[in-house]
Curated annotation (Swiss-Prot):
Name of the molecule in the record: Olfactory receptor 2T6
GO BP annotations, alphabetical order: detection of chemical stimulus involved in sensory perception of smell
One Gene Ontology term of the molecular function aspect: olfactory receptor activity
Residue intervals annotated with topology Extracellular: 1-28, 79-98, 167-203, 258-271
Family according to the record: Belongs to the G-protein coupled receptor 1 family.
Gene that encodes the chain: OR2T6
The organism of origin for this protein: Homo sapiens (Human)
CDD domains per the UniProt record, alphabetical: 7tmA_OR2T-like
Residue numbers on the Cytoplasmic membrane side: 50-57, 120-145, 225-236, 293-308
Residues carrying a glycan: N5
Highest taxon, organism lineage: Eukaryota
Cellular-component GO terms for this entry: plasma membrane
Amino acid sequence: MNENNETLTRGFTLMGLFTHNKCSGFFFGVICAVFFMAMIANGVMIFLINIDPHLHTPMYFLLSHLSVIDTLYISTIVPKMLVDYLMGEGTISFIACTAQCFLYMGFMGAEFFLLGLMAYDRYVAICNPLRYPVLISWRVCWMILASSWFGGALDSFLLTPITMSLPFCASHQINHFFCEAPTMLRLACGDKTTYETVMYVCCVAMLLIPFSVVTASYTRILITVHQMTSAEGRKKAFATCSSHMMVVTLFYGAALYTYTLPQSYHTPIKDKVFSAFYTILTPLLNPLIYSLRNRDVMGALKRVVARC
């Protein structure tokens, strides 16, 4: 009880993504650029998909909500990190840390599910195009979206209370750039069995199952593409699928490292780098890879510019 009362009073200190040295200004500038580019790219995607009738399709509906999640996701973590660097301190209250942990888990869980279900959407579009209007109807799209948000919310409501109710009797310095659950666990003392059990169940449900759906869908897509008679169409489809798989592998791979590998494989530097992949880099790559390279999206952008 004393440890919990002290934590509520003192809060925590975030050590940040990088230390203050002669290169820190460069890294700060890079992260600033990535953050603003991600916000602009996702904002453009949301705007175009909402105003252009040509993009009012199930696929772009899901992509617009992926952009919404990415915008919320990166906004939960990066602004606080940048302000901490400028102010030269990383203090965060217990309530703010709990809120950040809750929000990032919810957004991350929602994105895990949405990416998995979007891979299924692409599988149906390429492998069963004649049945696409039936299998991916607007009703199904809303169900996909609702299940993604429900999965993310369930992740937050399960893990956040358990994580933040642990007694933090070791140190109040978090060697990380945000309040990530596995890092918080290292500061805790006492019995962690309940947390580890819930974490294992959540990892199977939130990571391994969606990643298996993604892998199976894209494997089937690649087989179908390989059987295409048109060499140009096959080349274009392979290029699109490979870029999508790169983003998905980066996102899921980094998260699998963070949440499934034993503690003996982890170091603070590795944890920060892998976390940066799926919290900072992925929200920028998603709109670039999934959407802005798409001819329909670029056509919509040109039509908007022409009307201005």
